[in-house]
Amino acid sequence: MQHIRNFSIIAHIDHGKSTLADRLIHRCGGLAEREMSAQVLDSMDIERERGITIKAQTASLQYKSQDGTVYNLNLIDTPGHVDFSYEVSRSLSACEGALLVVDASQGVEAQTVANCYTAIELGVEVLPVLNKMDLPQADPEAARQEVEDVIGIDASEAVLASAKTGMGIDEILESIVARVPPPKGDPSAPLQALIIDSWFDNYVGVVMLVRIVNGVLKPKDKILLMASHATHLCEQIGVFTPKSQPRPELSAGEVGFVIAGIKELEHAKVGDTITLAGKPAAEPLPGFKEVKPQVFAGLYPVESSEYDQLRDSLEKLKLNDAALMFEPEVSQALGFGFRCGFLGLLHMEIVQERLEREFDMDIITTAPSVVYEVEQRDGTVVTIESPSRMPEIAKIADIREPIVKVTLFMPQEYVGPVMTLCNNKRGVQLNMSYHGRQVHLTYEIPLAEIVLDFFDKLKSVSRGYASMDYEFVEYRSADVVKVDLLINGDRVDALAMIAHRNNARYRAREVVSRMRGLIPRQMFDVAIQAAIGAEVIARENVKALRKNVLAKCYGGDISRKKKLLEKQKAGKKRMKQVGSVEIPQEAFLAILQVEDK
């Protein structure tokens, strides 16, 4: 065990984490030259294209250090994005060390800080690495200063490296061996293994990536998963060098994979503890929590005949993504579809993109909403994921909305516009500090304001320089109301929205006027109204198309004209009673694009 080192890499998007991982694998001879593809550990196409890492992956590398000892280095790759922060904390708790990769030309960014604090809380040894030293604009001194100011760790021994040219790779490996402590653990104690990640393989079922904390695991052992109380027979174990290689056993301190013929990903939850069914551990490893979706949206197939196909696609995605939740939902306007829960906006985009790309689905997504807690007058508390499920106003005692703490980093010239944006989004400023040329702002903002378009707006007011990170704080009472949309007096459930009372009238007017341009003219007048309860707060009319019935009367008597006009009017009235209005799909998207003032 003295020769094992478990470490992971922490970095903001695009600071060169995956490239560095490739270099380390290459240097330790994990893959032959011909098998090296860029970003070996990012296995999904979408991970490579967006340049982000979604699932954790591992590589066990054999490294012969300068004094001749062979060390077994386990690299655990972590996702860097805020939506996947739980996966990050699980990956980090399986390590004793972490490389903090900072782009020497850009300095520290928000997500790096968030993940770095997670690492420090878990007691992981953090080694700073200044990457991209081959760039002409690299400024190692400023970056070093920022690491010390913002994160507060000593960066005087930071390794200067460039993953692209391969400079500094040996120094990184040596500092891992020298500064990362070996794992603690007792091979003779009852088995405790942490599930770092799990995914579904078409041939063998669920593959679990585990870190053995205590004990030894061998094939043919009966294992027990402590959170889901499921027992399975362990079929195959091994390590990834990124290719999988079977092993006769995994003992304390090692990282590897376990295949136990599990059919459902629900059983192998990330963060759960594996132990032996015959000789179980006294208690599970700390830190496990159920991941709860924060953002909900409806997904509907464009062709209603593709409903079953959408369900199959979602089930297949769920095999690889335990955080995705979905349940069937029927909307009068959009037909049959699903209400899906996501960890955050990026997660939602990725699910949509994977549905379109891997399963060839055409889908409509309704406006994303967050989960509200509603306390009713009889004292019961219900959670509302969709505006159409909001109880009647008379029954509601209090509505609580989720509040998140947002950490923002940006160059000082953009502080003004960013603060204005946060205030418009009902933000409350908690803190502001300057570190060199970077400014660090902390705000509390309702999650509902963030899911709409906060991220896009932030990027546009700061010309792309600001970076953000958010974490859930609590539910707080809020003055929010449900705004219904009525078309010819009929409520359209899919168009209902929940808005803050101060903002409701403005948003209602915007949506209604936008809908007016999208609903085609009919043979009769169409009234589009927005209402809070019974009070109508905005209205637009779509004028009827009419034929000029007087065209054939030359001169003629006024009573003759009147008769024709009355006849037309009666016809229109009759039509309005039986006619129904087709709502085009663009109208549903209109709600998504309404700006808050």
UniProtKB/Swiss-Prot annotation:
Keyword Nucleotide-binding: yes
The keyword Protein biosynthesis belongs to this UniProt entry's keyword annotation: yes
Cross-referenced InterPro entries: EF-4, EFG_III/V, EFG_V-like, EFTu-like_2, G_TR_CS, LepA_C_sf, LepA_CTD, LepA_IV
Enzyme nomenclature, EC number: 3.6.5.n1
Catalysed conversion reaction: GTP + H2O = GDP + phosphate + H(+)
Main location: membrane
Gene3D superfamilies assigned to the protein according to its UniProt record, in alphabetical order: 3.30.70.240, Elongation factor 4, C-terminal domain (3.30.70.2570), Elongation Factor G (Translational Gtpase), domain 3 (3.30.70.870), P-loop containing nucleotide triphosphate hydrolases (3.40.50.300), Translation factors (2.40.30.10)
Family: Belongs to the TRAFAC class translation factor GTPase superfamily. Classic translation factor GTPase family. LepA subfamily.
Protein name: Elongation factor 4
Organism of origin: Bordetella parapertussis (strain 12822 / ATCC BAA-587 / NCTC 13253)
Gene: lepA
